[in-house]
C-alpha cells in the first residue's frame, strides 16, 4: 500500500488552513504528525478521507481517493477522531462490530466469526471481559481503546488517528500505539496526530512537522542524528535538547529536555 499526497490545500469556507502539502506513506509504517494547536493536523486527516473539500491529489496505490464510492473508501481508509460521536446505549462488543459494516451487504448482520474477531480485538486492546458493558459507562480512555478495536477488525489499508493518546495514561499511550504497529504488519500504514513529541519519537517510524498549515520537514527517529532531529523539532517547539538513553530493559529511548 502506498499513499501519495500531492500539493494538498484545504480549509473551511474562505479560510485556507493547509498550504500545498505533499508527502508519501508506505506500507508497514506508522507516521506521526506533529504541530502546535491550529497547525492543521486535524484538517489534514479530514481532507485525506474526503470530509473536507480540497485541491491537490490524494492517491492510494495510484488510485485517486475521490473516485472511490463511500463504501469502497470506508474499506480502504479508517479515521479515529478525537470524539467517537456515539451517544446511544450500546455494548462495547456492538461498537466493535461496527467495524465490519463496510464489508456487510444490505440487511446483513455480523456472523459468529466476526463476533469472535471483535472479542479478540477487545482483548488485544486491554478490554477483554467488557464485551457487554455499556459503551457510555466506559472511561474516556476505554472508549478510545474500544474505537481502536473497532478499527482493527475493519482491516483498512490506511489507518488515521487524531490524538488517540489524549485520554490515556502514560502506559496506555504506549500500549495503544504498540497495538497499532502490530496491526499494521507489512500491508497497512498509519498516520497519527500526536501532542506528545517524545511519545511520537519512540513509537513512530517517521514524523511530519506542521506549522501554520505548511509541512516544514520530516524526520526518522531510528535513522536521523540527534543534531538533525533537534534542529527539525525546534522549528515547531523552539530550542530543545534530545538525548538517547537506555530504559531498564536496555532498549534505547529518546528523551526531550527543554
Predicted regions and their residues:
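The feature captures the beta-strand-to-loop junction immediately N-terminal to the Walker
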Residues: 34-36
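Helix-to-loop junction immediately C-terminal to a conserved catalytic motif
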Residues: 49
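Conserved ABC transporter NBD signature motif
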Residues: 56-64, 73
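Conserved ABC ATPase signature
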Residues: 134-138
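Catalytic Walker B motif of ABC-type/P-loop ATPase nucleotide-binding domains
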Residues: 159-163
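H-loop/switch region of ABC-family ATPase nucleotide-binding domains
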Residues: 194-195
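ABC ATPase nucleotide-binding domains
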Residues: 229-258
Amino acid at each position: 500500500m502506498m499513499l501519495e499526497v500531492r500539493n494538498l490545500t484545504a480549509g473551511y469556507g474562505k479560510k485556507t488552513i493547509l498550504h500545498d502539502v505533499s508527502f508519501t506513506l508506505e506500507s508497514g509504517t506508522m507516521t506521526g504528525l506533529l504541530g502546535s494547536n491550529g497547525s492543521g493536523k486535524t484538517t489534514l486527516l479530514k481532507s485525506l478521507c474526503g470530509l473536507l473539500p480540497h485541491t491537490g491529489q490524494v492517491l492510494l496505490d495510484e488510485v485517486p481517493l475521490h473516485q472511490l464510492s463511500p463504501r469502497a473508501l470506508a474499506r480502504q481508509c479508517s479515521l479515529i477522531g478525537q470524539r467517537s460521536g456515539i451517544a446511544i446505549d450500546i455494548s462495547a462488543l456492538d461498537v466493535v462490530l461496527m467495524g465490519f459494516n463496510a464489508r456487510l451487504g444490505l440487511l446483513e448482520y455480523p456472523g459468529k466469526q466476526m463476533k469472535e474477531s471483535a472479542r479478540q480485538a477487545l482483548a488485544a486492546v486491554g478490554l477483554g471481559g467488557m464485551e457487554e458493558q455499556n459503551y457510555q459507562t466506559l472511561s474516556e480512555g476505554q472508549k478510545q481503546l474500544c474505537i481502536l478495536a473497532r478499527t482493527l477488525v475493519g482491516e483498512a489499508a490506511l489507518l488515521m488517528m487524531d490524538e488517540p493518546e489524549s485520554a490515556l495514561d502514560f502506559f496506555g499511550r504506549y500500549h495503544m500505539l504498540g497495538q497499532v504497529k502490530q496491526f499494521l504488519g507489512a500491508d497497512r500504514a498509519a498516520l497519527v496526530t500526536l501532542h506528545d513529541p517524545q511519545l511520537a519519537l519512540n513509537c513512530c517510524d517517521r514524523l511530519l512537522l506542521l506549522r501554520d498549515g505548511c509541512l516544514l520537514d520530516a524526520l526518522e527517529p531510528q535513522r536521523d542524528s540527534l543534531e538533525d532531529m533537534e534542529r527539525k523539532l525546534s522549528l515547531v517547539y523552539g530550542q530543545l535538547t534530545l538525548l538517547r538513553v537506555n530504559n531498564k530493559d536496555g532498549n534505547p529511548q529518546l528523551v526531550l529536555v527543554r
